[in-house]
């Protein structure tokens, strides 16, 4: 096993995000503007089947229209509990369940829109996750990605290489390249724009 590989496993994700769940919203809300912008780009229609992978505490729910069907999934039951609690006020048409984003319990071509916010830099294998998304998406379906990636066209700095074991321990990998990930799938990149922290976070929209 590679050094620090344990920090990129579902087991470790369950441990740390169970611990973070009670206070996650304190920091999570700093990305509200980008979450909203990303979801608006999907153009969710009435009756759409919307899947959130890595829903966390449900911070995306308030930006999703009332008249669609939402399934929120997360690897930890503590996060799902927070999502359900939040929805008692938001009153979205919501089903929430514990699920691994690398193994989706959905039939082929059954989902209209997928939201992947701050998950591709955390999930052990982002390529497997996107391939699963591609499988369950209906033809023409879209994916909203908001996450931290190495900025397009830049090489890894020494500082990022040094910091990554620490960030990977605490919350996520900061050295993943979206271009490398997307090169292994057949989804079309419709848009890719810089977002928070000087473009280290990006808002990306994919289509099947």
Task: Describe the function of each predicted region.
Residues 1-45, 59-60, 82, 86, ...:
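Conserved class I S-adenosyl-L-methionine
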Residues 4-12, 27, 144-203:
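C-terminal alpha-helical "lid/dimerization" subdomain adjacent to the S-adenosyl-L-methionine
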Residues 47, 137-143:
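Short glycine-dipeptide loop
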Residues 49-103:
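Class I SAM-dependent methyltransferase SAM/SAH-binding core
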Residues 102-114:
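A short acidic, Gly/Pro-enriched loop at the edge of an enzyme's catalytic core
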Residues 113-125:
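A short SAM/SAH-binding and catalytic strip from SAM-dependent methyltransferases
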Residues 127-139:
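A short glycine-rich, Lys/Arg-flanked "PGG" loop and its adjoining helix->strand segment in the class I
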